[in-house]
């Protein structure tokens, strides 16, 4: 009985090179061990990533105790039990020797006796753990088990032993080990690593087929037949893949089979006649093989079928020109131009004519070109073409036609810049200025940047100072135009624009800008929106009066502005006053009075009354002044200034009683804006009239209304300044009365102010006893703390402040007495401490 293990086929590389060493997974595959007589036994193969080796074993009865294979460094070791060492194993002639590897396969025949020993055969390991290559293990045995072999010491075994051992082997099939550590490996495999290793080994690259040498015509025909069959099969699989057709035709062309290649191209055109590459390859084949007429026919068919493909036209005209057929090329160009192609096609036609010195034909083409593509750049190219060939008059006409063609609606600065540069080259500087100014007057500023730049450069080169200033003014004018167009209610921009125009332009141009500016009336009738706008009218009127010297137009401007202002909601006293002053300068006093009277009637304002009264005072019309003051006080009885001015007017006129009556009316008003000023003016008036009793009565009446410290001081100083007998006594009495009155006053600073004024009086006019008396009334300054609270009532800390404690108030407050006693006790304690320190000092002195 012999057991043979043979035909083990694997890939060349070892499995360990393709499997991640960190993978903890265990994959098992079971294969059948096929015997030569049809018997099968399971062959178990297992890949262990832990050892990076393939382990496999046979489930035969003789191997069930050690079914697995031990790991070796180079591959897998096949264990077969034997009674002797591996050196006692004999291999059959057709089998490979142990440890031998031959072209990716190993065939081993192992014969062993019944006694246990190990036969180790290193086998190559497949690259993939799933074994892309199959293998067969054949066992030759009549009794389906190992038999004894003479000279080997292997004992025979019976079939029953084999069956028992087989059953035991089937029960002991290795199980998949459970993975206990499921944590990820420290080093992870990446796709980059897999791709790099695959590229290094180049497993997917197949070796090139061997070169075939053709030695006779029969082999050549056979080769052609096979290639044509291959091409036809490819075409039959997918007819729409044009590359297959082109390869087929090029292969036929390489064999000089032009007719066949032409037939293939025609078949391909039937499939997809819109394919540009197909037409190009077809025509190129004909041209390479010098089939000119065929090429012409193909190009004709191509441009007829696909007239918008410029590449066909370019190659067709180029072929005709290379063949020297200039007329034919021109005819092709003409056919092309009928389709009105893109600009480059026209330029190609023009350059073609210029290569043959056909300037007139090129000019004709340009005439057609600028009509088909009417762009500014094309007109400029046409003009430069004429200039290049020294047709300057024609070039000027082209520019003029272009300016007329585009008109004012589609003006482009590049056209005028090119036109001006052309005239500059011709030394026509006046023409250049006219062109620039014409363009600047009609093109918006944002579209004329290049125009301004070139105009400035031109003036710097050929102009004078005035010309440069004109450019700057023009540039600023366009800037302001853009600003006011963007925002018509931007009155600051209008002011700047008008200032610029007034300094340079004529009167009509200035008036036009003013009319445009004042036409932008504020949309909201609120005075804050009209404040800047009304100055446009004022500047307009002043310009007409001072610059244009047109009084009648100035009057019209004033009247128009006054009619525009909504006087029921608000008015502008400045406008009325300026109008009245203008009429006075024109010696129209009646119109001035009428204007001021109208303003007072429509919207009485203090400023209007004051100006009108001042005017009448200058004219010495006092009756009119009285009437105006009366009217003024009817509209504003709370205005103390008006009352004072009215009384002063009567005082100047010598009507004292009338002035006193005006003051009495004034102080009797229930509401006044500045009553203290009015009372002071009334008192000063009585003092000037030397009415002491009236003045004293006024002070008493004023003190009934207010107990302000300044009133008391002023009253005392009045009594002192009267100069009569007993004035000092009356003054002192007033101070004493004021002091008594202000004891209950919360404002201690005012009371202190009164005492300081009283002390100054006593120092100047009083005796020593009077001074001492006032000094005793002076308060003591004390620093205190108080809690500070915010607006929401929360505490904000403490603050220090100075308070004044008056002796008169301290006598009535027991807590102040307690504070005084505490200060006295503290003083006594300090004196006592000082006395205790003096004896020590005496002892020190005696010792020294």
From Swiss-Prot:
Belongs to the crooked-neck family. Residues 81-106, 827-848 are annotated as: Disordered. It is found in: Nucleus; Nucleus speckle. Residues 828-840 have a biased composition (Basic and acidic residues). The modification Phosphoserine is found at residue 503. Its main location: nucleus. GO terms for molecular function: RNA binding. Involved in pre-mRNA splicing process. As a component of the minor spliceosome, involved in the splicing of U12-type introns in pre-mRNAs. This is Crooked neck-like protein 1. GO terms for biological process: mRNA splicing, via spliceosome; spliceosomal complex assembly. HAT repeats lie at residues 222-254, 256-288, 290-322, 324-355, 357-388, 390-425, 427-461, 471-503, 505-539, 549-585, 587-618, 620-652, 654-688, 690-721, 726-767, 769-807, 809-834.
């Amino acid at each position: 009985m012999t057991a043979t293990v043979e035909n083990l086929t694997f890939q060349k590389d070892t499995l360990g090179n393709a499997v991640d060493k960190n993978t903890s997974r265990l994959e098992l595959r079971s294969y059948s061990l096929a015997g030569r007589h049809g018997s099968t036994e399971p062959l178990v193969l297992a890949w262990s990533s832990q050892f990076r080796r393939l382990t496999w074993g046979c489930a035969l009865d003789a191997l069930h105790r050690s079914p697995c294979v031990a790991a070796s460094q180079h591959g897998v070791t096949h264990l077969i039990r034997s009674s002797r060492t591996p050196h006692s194993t004999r291999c059959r002639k057709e089998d490979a020797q142990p440890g031998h590897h031959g072209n990716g396969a190993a065939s081993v025949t192992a014969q062993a006796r019944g006694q246990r020993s190990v036969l180790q055969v290193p086998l190559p390991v497949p690259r993939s753990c799933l074994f892309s290559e199959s293998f067969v293990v054949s066992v030759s045995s009549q009794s389906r088990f190992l038999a004894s072999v003479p000279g080997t010491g292997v004992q025979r075994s019976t079939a029953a032993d084999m069956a028992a051992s087989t059953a035991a082997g089937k029960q002991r099939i290795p199980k998949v080990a459970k993975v206990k550590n499921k944590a990820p490996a420290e080093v992870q495999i990446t796709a980059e690593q897999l791709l790099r290793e695959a590229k290094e080994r180049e497993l997917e690259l197949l070796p090139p087929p061997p070169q075939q040498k053709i030695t006779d015509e029969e082999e050549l025909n056979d080769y052609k037949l096979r290639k044509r069959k291959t091409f036809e099969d490819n075409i039959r699989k997918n007819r729409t893949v044009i590359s297959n057709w082109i390869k087929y035709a090029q292969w036929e062309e390489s064999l000089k089979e032009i007719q066949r290649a032409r037939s293939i191209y025609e078949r391909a055109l039937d499939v997809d006649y819109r394919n540009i590459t197909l037409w190009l390859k077809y025509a190129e084949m004909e041209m390479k093989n010098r089939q000119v007429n065929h090429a012409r026919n193909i190009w004709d068919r191509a441009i007829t079928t696909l007239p918008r493909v410029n590449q066909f036209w370019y190659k067709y005209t180029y072929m005709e020109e290379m063949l020297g057929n200039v007329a034919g090329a021109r005819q092709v160009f003409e056919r092309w131009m009928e389709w009105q192609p893109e600009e480059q096609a026209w330029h190609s036609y023009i350059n073609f004519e210029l290569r043959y010195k056909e300037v007139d034909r090129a000019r004709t083409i340009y005439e057609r070109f600028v009509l088909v593509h009417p762009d500014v750049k094309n007109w400029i190219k046409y003009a430069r073409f004429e200039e290049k060939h020294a047709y300057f008059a024609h070039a000027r006409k082209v520019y003029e036609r272009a300016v007329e063609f585009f008109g004012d609606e589609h003006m482009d600065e590049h056209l005028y810049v090119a036109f001006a540069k052309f005239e500059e080259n011709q030394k026509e500087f006046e023409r250049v200025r006219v062109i620039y100014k014409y363009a600047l007057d009609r093109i918006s500023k944002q579209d004329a940047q290049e125009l301004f730049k070139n105009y400035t450069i031109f003036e710097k080169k050929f102009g004078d100072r005035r010309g440069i200033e004109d450019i700057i003014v023009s540039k600023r004018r366009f800037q302001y135009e853009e600003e006011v167009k963007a925002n018509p209610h931007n009155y600051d921009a209008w002011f700047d624009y008008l200032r610029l125009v007034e300094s340079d332009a004529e009167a009509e141009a200035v008036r036009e800008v003013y009319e445009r500016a004042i036409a932008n009336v504020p949309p909201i009738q609120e005075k804050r929106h009209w404040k800047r706008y009304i100055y446009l009218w004022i500047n307009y009127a002043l310009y007409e009066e001072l610059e244009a010297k047109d009084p009648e137009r100035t009057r019209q401007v004033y009247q128009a502005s006054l009619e525009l202002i909504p006087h029921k909601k608000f008015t502008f006293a400045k406008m009325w006053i300026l109008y009245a002053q203008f009429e006075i300068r024109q010696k129209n006093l009646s119109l001035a009075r009428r204007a001021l009277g109208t303003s007072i009637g429509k919207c009485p304002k203090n400023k209007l009354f004051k100006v009108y009264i001042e005017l009448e005072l200058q004219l010495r019309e006092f009756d009119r002044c009285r009437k105006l003051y009366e009217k003024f006080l009817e509209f504003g009885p709370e205005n103390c200034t008006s009352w004072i001015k009215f009384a002063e007017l009567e005082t100047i006129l010598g009507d004292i009683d009338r002035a006193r009556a005006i003051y009495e009316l004034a102080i009797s008003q229930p509401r006044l804006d500045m009553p203290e000023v009015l009372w002071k003016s009334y008192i000063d008036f009585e003092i000037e009239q030397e009415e002491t009793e009236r003045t004293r009565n006024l002070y008493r009446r004023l003190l009934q209304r207010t107990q302000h410290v300044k009133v008391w001081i002023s009253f005392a100083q009045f009594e002192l300044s009267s100069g009569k007998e007993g004035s000092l006594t009356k003054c002192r009495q007033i101070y004493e009365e004021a002091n008594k009155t202000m004891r209950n006053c919360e404002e201690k600073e005012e009371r202190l102010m009164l005492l300081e004024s009283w002390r100054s009086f006593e120092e100047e006019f009083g005796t020593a006893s009077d001074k001492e008396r006032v000094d005793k009334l002076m308060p003591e300054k004390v620093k205190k703390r108080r809690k500070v609270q915010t607006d929401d009532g929360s505490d904000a800390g403490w603050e220090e402040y100075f308070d004044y404690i008056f002796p008169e108030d301290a006598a009535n407050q027991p807590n102040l007495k307690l504070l005084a006693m505490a200060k006295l006790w503290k003083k006594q304690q300090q004196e006592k401490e000082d006395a205790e320190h003096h004896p020590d000092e005496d002892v020190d002195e005696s010792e020294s």
